[in-house]
Amino acid sequence: MLKGIHPAISPDLLKILAEMGHGDELVLSDAHFPAHQLHHKVVRADGISINSLLTGITPLFEFDTYTEAPLIMMQAVEGDSLDPAVEQSYLQTIKSAVGNVPKLARMDRFAFYERAKQAYAVVITGETAKYGNIIIKKGVTPVK
């Protein structure tokens, strides 16, 4: 155990966060996401919500400022609806940790799957919120 590291951040996830370079993306997926079909680098965070992971990741993670939207979520499939409270809770969690909210974009389901294939890794969570998947893009960590 390390001081200052949120308990939702496993050693495997901490290693991935450290390995990621600027421009790399991390998928935080819900419990139903086809992660193993889409990607070879999968970390399990069973029973842990995406909000809890965002609480732990955000203080360690610089969001990309060179892209229009460093946050990406899946848009609802035609004829379906999504709960805007899911997005709002994620954005509030990020804002609480870093003081601002990066821009978020949405893409259709299959475009999201294709984007996930290109990510650095996928984290399967215990999240059950419909359309709860989110991709976060890492930026350049400032030197202090």
Swiss-Prot record:
Active site: H22 (proton donor)
Keyword set, alphabetical order: Carbohydrate metabolism, Cytoplasm, Fucose metabolism, Isomerase
EC numbers on record: 5.1.3.29
Pathway in which the depicted protein is active: Carbohydrate metabolism; L-fucose metabolism
GO molecular function, one term: L-fucose mutarotase activity
GO cellular component entries: cytoplasm
Reaction it catalyzes: alpha-L-fucose = beta-L-fucose
Intracellular or extracellular location(s): Cytoplasm
Residues annotated to bind substrate: D30, R109, Y131, G132, N133
Any one of the GO BP annotations: fucosylation
Family per similarity comment: Belongs to the RbsD / FucU family. FucU mutarotase subfamily.
Cited function: Involved in the anomeric conversion of L-fucose.
Subunit structure as annotated in this protein's UniProt entry: Homodecamer.
HAMAP family per the UniProt record, alphabetical: L_fucose_rotase
PANTHER family: FUCOSE MUTAROTASE
Protein name: L-fucose mutarotase
Organism from which the protein derives: Histophilus somni (strain 2336) (Haemophilus somnus)
Gene name tied to this protein: fucU
